[in-house]
């Protein structure tokens, strides 16, 4: 491969400058501010601050409400990732077949990804609204007392479905691309040997999708941590009784609603550390089981 050379030595730095500026402004600067404020105790108006060392972290880690948010986040992340990836893989497998109008169907499946999180949340809230929602009416007709604004389990189920629906389109694109990259000769050879559809999928298709699945696992984990804030805020507001208050929503609630800036900053630092550690763990241990050839 021929080495790429630039006629001007300064040009590469100009090309990198926009990305460097964005990274510094929208990541390093906010992260440094959060780390600084996590060691301070400020009043609600930010007029006075006191250095308290690790007091904010100690208070957060000993707070039962924070530990409850950790449990809620784990349940929410696992359910959202499994549902979004499972349904996307099922749809991608169906769309990979040569059928009439497959381009049209694929386009329809991609559209939900363009919907804003808050809009997606309001859409599902309207569908399952206890007073006027279509599905809520059907559930009541079948004897199910549906009210996600009062029942914590129902609220969790609703935000999981809304968050997974939003992410299915993204996963679908990558699974379709992964399926199209699998040589058809392998599947045809297995079919000739007498392997049925389910056996061909689990012994040939699914192992060859391991790189794609691993990548989507990391992406969906980060998505469930951060990008679902708008859905939870629009649908449940963290309720009822903190049943859907995830870590990122508790950061917002304590910082912007309760104006406890020190505690909120400490929580954001802990959340950042959790995501970094979890991602590193996935790349360090899970990736060992992924075969790229």
UniProtKB/Swiss-Prot annotation:
GO BP: transmembrane transport
Residues making up the signal peptide according to the UniProt record: none
Localisation per UniProt entry: Cell inner membrane
Residue intervals passing through the bilayer: 10-30, 72-92, 108-128, 155-177, 204-224, 261-281
Cellular component GO terms, alphabetical: plasma membrane
Residue ranges occupied by any ABC transmembrane type-1 domain in the UniProt entry: 66-282
InterPro entries the record matches: MetI-like, MetI-like_sf, UgpAE/MalFG_permease
Membrane topology value: Multi-pass membrane protein
Main location per the UniProt record: membrane
UniProt record similarity statement: Belongs to the binding-protein-dependent transport system permease family.
Alphabetical list of NCBIfam families matching this protein: PRK10561.1
Assembly and interaction partners: The complex is composed of two ATP-binding proteins (UgpC), two transmembrane proteins (UgpA and UgpE) and a solute-binding protein (UgpB).
Role played: Part of the ABC transporter complex UgpBAEC involved in sn-glycerol-3-phosphate (G3P) import. Probably responsible for the translocation of the substrate across the membrane.
Protein name: sn-glycerol-3-phosphate transport system permease protein UgpA
Species the sequence originates in: Brucella abortus (strain 2308)
Highest classification ranks of the organism: Bacteria, Pseudomonadati, Pseudomonadota, Alphaproteobacteria, Hyphomicrobiales
């Amino acid at each position: 491969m021929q080495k790429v050379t630039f006629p001007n030595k300064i040009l590469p730095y100009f090309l990198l400058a926009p990305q460097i500026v964005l990274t510094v402004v929208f990541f390093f600067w906010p992260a440094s501010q959060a780390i600084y404020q996590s060691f301070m105790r400020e009043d609600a108006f930010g007029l006075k601050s006191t250095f308290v060392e690790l007091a904010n972290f100690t208070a957060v880690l000993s707070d039962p409400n924070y530990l409850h948010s950790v449990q809620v986040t784990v349940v929410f992340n696992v359910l959202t990732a499994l549902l979004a990836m499972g349904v996307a893989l099922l749809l991608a497998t169906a769309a990979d077949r040569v059928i009439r109008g497959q381009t049209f169907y694929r386009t329809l499946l991609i559209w939900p990804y363009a919907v804003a999180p808050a809009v997606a949340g309001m859409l599902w809230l309207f569908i399952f609204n206890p007073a006027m929602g279509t599905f809520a009416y059907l559930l009541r007709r079948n004897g199910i007392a549906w009210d996600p604004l009062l029942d914590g389990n129902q609220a969790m189920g609703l935000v999981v479905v809304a968050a997974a629906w939003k992410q299915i389109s993204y996963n679908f694109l990558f699974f379709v691309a992964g399926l199209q990259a699998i040589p058809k000769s392998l599947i045809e050879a297995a079919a000739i040997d007498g392997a049925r559809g389910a056996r061909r999928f689990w012994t040939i298709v699914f192992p060859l999708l391991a790189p794609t699945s691993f990548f989507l696992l990391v992406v969906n984990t980060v998505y469930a941590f951060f990008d679902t804030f708008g859905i939870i805020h629009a649908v449940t507001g963290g309720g009822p009784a903190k049943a859907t208050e995830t870590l990122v929503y508790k950061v917002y609630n304590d910082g912007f609603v309760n104006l406890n800036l020190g505690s909120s900053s400490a929580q954001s630092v802990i959340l950042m550390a959790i995501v970094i550690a979890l991602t590193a763990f996935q790349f360090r241990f899970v990736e060992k089981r992924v075969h790229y050839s």
